């Protein structure tokens, strides 16, 4: 975490070299709460795979029915959250205020209060993006904070959830059952889920670098039974255990992470897959759909 170190009652900031060392050493932040995460995983790599019109196609009746409500779990310092917001609303670079908040509202949460504070300070769309400090695995706090946000719009669930490179950190810190519960909570909270799972090689790298830094190893790493092809493992858990269906794979980022879109099966009648989106996938030969 990018938290100042207290020495002799004073606050001493990390030097640029120290901070850069921590940024480039995954495992230094055991919850994935790296400072300046976007330096080595820039938002543009995800955006190039995602159709800008995706939300309009999934929710053609908004904003007549109120804004689209999104949940971004593990938002870090908000760079990707802001980039997704601008991308899906086709907002030009440099725009800092917009009436688009009537179309799309995004609740962004992270376990690290320092990163959340930075996100709040730097967000160019404070009316549309809300940042909160939340340990998503704390059931009581999660229920209170998420329900408070949803109640403002008379809703009980989010339209879409974003889970971008978070599953590994939940898995390493909470074990197999923790990952299963995390995905259960997310699937119960959202009509759609966009998930970017980390592959197993990232688990090994995170554990190795943690040991290299002389820090305590992840409690669950060696006992995990869910391992191997992690994107497929995530698909199996969500589709077989949590009532979701995989409707789209948008391809892989340059760091070999797939972007997977799921839909809750109980929303099939109210949220049919847009034919235009299916055709676009066929034309570009990079989107795959499974229709029940």
From Swiss-Prot:
Its EC number is 2.1.1.-. Residues 53-274 form the Bin3-type SAM domain. PANTHER family: BICOID-INTERACTING PROTEIN RELATED (PTHR12315), RNA 5'-MONOPHOSPHATE METHYLTRANSFERASE (PTHR12315:SF1). Changing residue 135 to A: Decreased O-methyltransferase activity. Belongs to the methyltransferase superfamily. This is RNA 5'-monophosphate methyltransferase. S-adenosyl-L-methionine binds at residues 46, 76, 110, 135-136, 164. It comes from the Eukaryota. Changing residue 136 to G: Abolished O-methyltransferase activity. Changing residue 74 to A: Abolished O-methyltransferase activity. Interacts with DICER1; the interaction may be mediated by RNA. It comes from Homo sapiens (Human).
């Amino acid at each position: 975490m990018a938290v100042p170190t207290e020495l002799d009652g004073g606050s001493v900031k990390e030097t640029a070299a120290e901070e850069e060392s921590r940024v480039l050493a995954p495992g230094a932040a055991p919850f994935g709460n790296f400072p300046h995460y976007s330096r080595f995983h820039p938002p543009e790599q995800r955006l190039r795979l995602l159709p800008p019109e995706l939300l309009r196609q999934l929710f053609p009746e908004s904003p007549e029915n109120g804004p689209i409500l999104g949940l971004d779990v593990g938002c870090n310092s908000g760079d990707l959250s802001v980039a997704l917001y601008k991308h899906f609303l086709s907002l030009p670079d440099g725009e800092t205020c917009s009436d688009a908040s009537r179309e799309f509202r995004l609740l962004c949460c992270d376990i690290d209060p320092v990163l959340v504070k930075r996100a709040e300070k730097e967000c160019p769309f404070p009316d549309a993006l809300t940042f909160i400090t939340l340990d998503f695995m704390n059931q009581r706090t999660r229920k209170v904070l998420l329900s408070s946000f949803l109640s403002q719009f008379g809703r009980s669930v989010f339209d879409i959830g974003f889970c971008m490179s978070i599953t590994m950190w939940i898995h390493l810190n909470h074990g197999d059952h923790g990952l299963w519960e995390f995905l259960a909570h997310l699937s119960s909270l959202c009509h759609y889920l966009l998930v970017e799972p980390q592959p197993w090689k990232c688990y090994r790298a995170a554990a190795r670098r943690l040991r290299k830094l002389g820090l305590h190893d992840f409690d669950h790493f060696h006992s995990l039974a869910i391992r191997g092809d992690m994107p497929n493992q995530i698909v199996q858990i969500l589709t077989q255990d949590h009532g979701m269906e995989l409707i789209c794979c948008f391809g892989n980022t340059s760091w070999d992470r797939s972007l997977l879109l799921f839909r809750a099966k109980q929303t099939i009648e109210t949220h049919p897959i847009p034919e235009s989106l299916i055709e676009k996938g066929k034309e570009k030969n990079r989107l795959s759909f499974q229709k029940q």
